[in-house]
Amino acid sequence: MNERGAINHMSSLTQVGWYWNRLRDLSVADFVGRTGSSASRAAARRRLEAPLPVPVARLDRVGAAWLPKAAPAQRGVVLQRADEVLSGQWRIFSRLLGLGFPPEWNRNPDGEVLLPITDGRRMAFRDTAAHGDVKYLRELNRHRELVVLAQAWQLTGRQRYLDGAALLLESWFAQCPHPRGANWSSALEAAIRLINWATVWQLLGGMQSPLFEGPVGKLLRTDWLNSIWHHAEFIRGFRSRDAAASHPLVGELAGLFVAGATWPQWPEAQLWRRAGREGLECEVLRQSAADGVHREQATGYQQLVWDFFLFAGLAARGTGKPFSAAYWQRMEAMLEYVAGIMDAGGHVPLFGDSDESLVSGLSIGAGGCPFHSQLATGALLFGNPSLARKAGMVDPRTEWLLGVDACGRFDELLLQGAVATPRTDFPEGGMFVLGSGLDSPDEFRVVANAGPLGLGGVAAHGHADALSFTLSVAGRPFLIDPGTGTYHGPEKWRHAFRGSAMHNTLVLAGEDQAVSGGRFLWLRRYRTSVLARERSQAVDSLVAEHDGYRRLPGKPVHRRSWQVDRCAASMTVQDQVFAATPQGVTLYWHFSEDCNVTCTPDGLSIANGPICLEMALPEGGDVSVLHGSESPLAGWVSRGYDVLEPSTTVVWRGRVEDGEILRTVLRRV
């Protein structure tokens, strides 16, 4: 969600709060920059209204080659996906849709609404009833499927894949003239298209591709180069520019740099490379903590941002001028965090927002888990045996990115026998891994969240999930983060999935820990503090608290401690509320959709396949077990964007005095 999209979903009153939260994050330099940005955007709008002719491309200039020339042996699902596309079948999020070949690029697959060809930058998409969810249209227009067609051609040499790629490009240029229509409304979307176009350009042979043979081919090349120039200049004119910017800025900078490295045919390409390099070197350190946690506190966007950094980094290596050591070190730290929170079954908690975004078509052609793919790629890039151990094997995408020869070193890394979870504490990001037998068949893994709400003043993609946690046993999820649900669907679902009650934490007075101002806005945040951390052979424990409820009567503070008995595969969770007055509290426990939860005389029995847990809840209080409930909204999990599946939520309600301990015990049996 970009800045403009966030504003579109607010009332006029909450817009005041939004602007205030934005302004709190701005430095003097940011104010000056935004003033200059406003002027440059005004100039860009004037260019859009009367577009300048594209400078003549210097065809004798050769861009950086940053992908291997030889196709790998692993085909993944490339041919299957390529044939689907040629038959008019497109996978948009969880849906397989018959959109035709080529599709109507301005028709939103969600609702089949044909959007007008007006000035893209002035289009608004807040009326989902009229326009559908714009994310579906944007997924289609990222051109990841074009990459799959290029891969299929390189693997087989079959003309139909090359012809299909040509037809998709020609139809897009005809239907989406610069700067008209929804596909010219977002600098981030233009950047993702450029990254995929750069990949396709190399897979099909670059300037000498058979795609460009004959008069028709030369015309296609001219149209493509013209659109590339427009894309890069569009990003340069409309990219995010203030200190509160999040992952869209990283994507925009990555697309700009990749374009400048791949297509140096114009003088402006040097400006694209310079702006991209300087911005990315800054953002990799600003947006990701030194311990590797991306500051949006959203696992899905951690994956997306890492790929932006990766593709720009590979393109920079191709130019012979790589990014700094600090850039690559921060990327390695990001993967060590992913390795830390991934359980023995390969599951990663769904903290914060996720829209299932993938940067590259190489990912959909490979199939499999994008996190595993990144771990394999990182193991080879950094020579990191722990990442290799966690990844387990080289996936097809890594072979396409790094080449078969480079991937041959993977087994050497595995043979070093490194631990698969090199770090368990990520204090700057507020994430801690507790447990026993990590990465073994008997693993008991807890991922505790004592981190901040999110990035910047609005924390657009953070959830109010302070002191929540996940639990997996033997590689099977038990207590989970239910995910995201939807961005633009029914408002009650959006607010529920980002609210505190949809997380494994304690809720006071039925209120969220932070005060929401809209779908992508938190008006009042909380602060978390880690009070104690202990690791020994017998015990793994953490104590933390947050102040999000101090706005309520009695100024309550919630404190939680986790203590894992490493010998008994059990955990005790203790909750306390420190307040001047008694408080009504609710504890929420969200179980995986694969869990069977039953009540017993002593509490609860939870089974996930052959693995069973016993759960003892605090004494007293009222207990309810909800499954797919809409009133209240509980008992749901969202594994994919706009996808809901019933699960089980256990709710405990009661009243507590100042400092009274609520004790919950989970034990493997």
Name what the model sees in each region.
Residues 5-28:
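Compositionally biased, charge-rich terminal segments
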Residues 18, 22-26, 34, 46, ...:
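Beta-strand-rich N-terminal accessory domains
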Residues 33-128, 133-140:
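Extended, charge-enriched "interface" segments that sit outside catalytic cores
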Residues 115-332, 336-342, 347:
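Aromatic-lined, polymer-binding surfaces characteristic
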Residues 141, 252, 334, 428-430, ...:
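Residues that flank catalytic or metal-binding motifs in active/ligand-binding sites
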Residues 191, 354-355, 361-367, 371, ...:
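CBM-like, beta-strand-rich accessory domains located in the C-terminal region of large
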Residues 293, 297-479, 531-535:
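Carbohydrate-active enzyme catalytic cores, enriched for enzymes
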